[in-house]
Regions:
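Structural signal for interior beta-strand "rungs" in well-ordered beta-sheet cores
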Residues: 1-66, 70-73
Length: 80
């Protein structure tokens, strides 16, 4: 389920069953696996969310996050 006023960036992959609440923003090149994303949450570019995560706060760009509530655990790509 994807609610009203959501913004989803290009090349993002959302696997089912994922629930995205109203006014959530998903950045570019994100990978989201069967998660719950609460309303008015922003997920940064290139973020990856682990299976079954519940996102209640903003997730920065370029991180891998998972859990309930979802927390960043490490950078997705090392900076050059």
């Amino acid at each position: 389920h994807i609610a009203h006023n959501c913004v989803i960036g290009k090349n993002s992959m959302i696997l089912v069953p994922t629930s995205v609440s109203g006014s959530a923003e998903i950045g570019e090149d994100c990978h989201i696996a069967a998660d719950i994303i609460r309303n008015q949450v922003k997920i940064g570019d290139r973020a990856m969310l682990g299976l079954g995560s519940v996102v209640v706060k903003d997730i920065p760009e370029n991180v891998i996050a998972y859990g309930n509530p979802a927390r960043p655990v490490r950078k997705r790509f090392e900076e050059a």
